Amino acid sequence: MTADTSSGDAAVAGASAGAEIHWFGGRFWGVSESLVGTLTPRISGEPDLHVGHFYGSQEASDLSEPDYEGLPQGASTSTHMLAGAVAGIMEHCLMFPIDCVKTRMQSLQPEPAARYRNVMDALWRIMRTEGIWRPIRGLNITAVGAGPAHALYFACYERLKKVLSDIIHPGANSHLANGAAGCVATLLHDAAMNPTEVVKQRMQMYNSPYRSVLDCMRCVWQREGALAFYRSYTTQLTMNVPFQALHFMTYEYLQELLNPQRHYNPSSHMVSGALAGAIAAAATTPLDVCKTLLNTQESLAVDSVSRSGRHITGLGHAFRTVYRLGGLPAYFKGVQARVIYQMPSTAISWSVYEFFKYMITKHQHEKRRIQRDAEK
């Protein structure tokens, strides 16, 4: 689908199953009607408009569009949930092979065949020795969990960010509010995502004994009980609360520098998301290593610390086990893969989220404008 701008107006023609997105002057020009209806994205040369501000005549005000950051009028909670769900699914699906490598590189006592030099070496060897589909084993359960988890995550964050900002720093952005909103949103996200993480990481491990996702879920339930799906929840929160607080504060700070008007700007969302993800990922890698150990209950690690084969339980137990088996360097196993995963992952997540939030909000505005015109 292409946009015809020869007369100075942008029109979206035809309908397609996907979206063909063209970058021009930092703007998206084409978008599938199947996703958000017949839309006219803003093009370079159009005036930047804010919520509650209109320029020119009444006709110009009818054609104006709200700033997509205008939460009360511009984007409802359902908009944030829909945009967040799509962003979460795309983020996890596109980056899943790297996530598989990260899980394996965090193994404390890997088999000789599962010792990798770097991310690319790991990907190549996994596909060559275990099959081309092995790096995406467990993708289905991840996609199922990522949708609702990210819907809650972004909707909660956007709502609390505004409420807390109005309390802490009325009329302006507050980094403290951003961090606090990110922490609370993480509680909901991890509650929905933690069982998925347990199954996913067990499917990703080298020589995983499970035939399928359902087989893994049944075995974990029968052998370890229902609580096994939340064994790493406190560790996950201990890792993700500071991760998301740092992530959101860094993202919002970079947005103030790169996009001070807070308009829809794909390049600034991508750069801010990538840098925020990289910084937060590197800082919280030790906690991620412990979370992986708690989720996978890596057999060699468990056997080496307990002859009885007792499960590793709790963050303190995991920290002691990691140090006993590998010393301080073990806390940063897989840091390269984690940063490589998080940079594009958060860039994709924020870019897709902001894109859909912008387009859905614009579509809602267009519908309201058409309704007003019909009533005249």
Swiss-Prot record:
Please give the tissue specificity annotation from the record for this chain. Ubiquitous. Expressed at low levels throughout the whole embryo at 24 hpf.
The superkingdom listed in its UniProt entry is Eukaryota
Annotated GO biological process:
iron import into the mitochondrion
What keywords is this UniProt entry annotated with? Ion transport, Iron, Iron transport, Membrane, Mitochondrion, Mitochondrion inner membrane, Repeat, Transmembrane, Transmembrane helix, Transport
**Any idea where this protein resides?**
Mitochondrion inner membrane
UniProt topology in membrane: Multi-pass membrane protein
GO molecular-function annotation terms?
ferrous iron transmembrane transporter activity
Q: A cellular component term (GO) from this record?
A: mitochondrial membrane
Q: What are the start and end residues of each Solcar repeat? A: 75-163, 173-257, 264-359
The chemistry this enzyme catalyses reads: Fe(2+)(in) = Fe(2+)(out)
Provide the transmembrane region boundaries. 77-96, 138-157, 175-194, 232-251, 266-285, 334-353
Keyword Transmembrane helix tagged: yes
Question: Entry's Pfam families?
Answer: Mito_carr (PF00153)
Q: What InterPro entries does the entry give?
A: Mitochondrial_sb/sol_carrier (IPR018108), Mt_carrier_dom_sf (IPR023395)
Instruction: Please classify the protein's predominant subcellular localization into one broad category.
Output: mitochondrion
Q: Does the keyword Transmembrane helix apply?
A: yes
Q: What does this protein do?
A: Mitochondrial iron transporter that mediates iron uptake. Probably required for heme synthesis of hemoproteins and Fe-S cluster assembly in non-erythroid cells.
Family in the record? Belongs to the mitochondrial carrier (TC 2.A.29) family.
Name of the featured protein: Mitoferrin-2
The gene designation is slc25a28
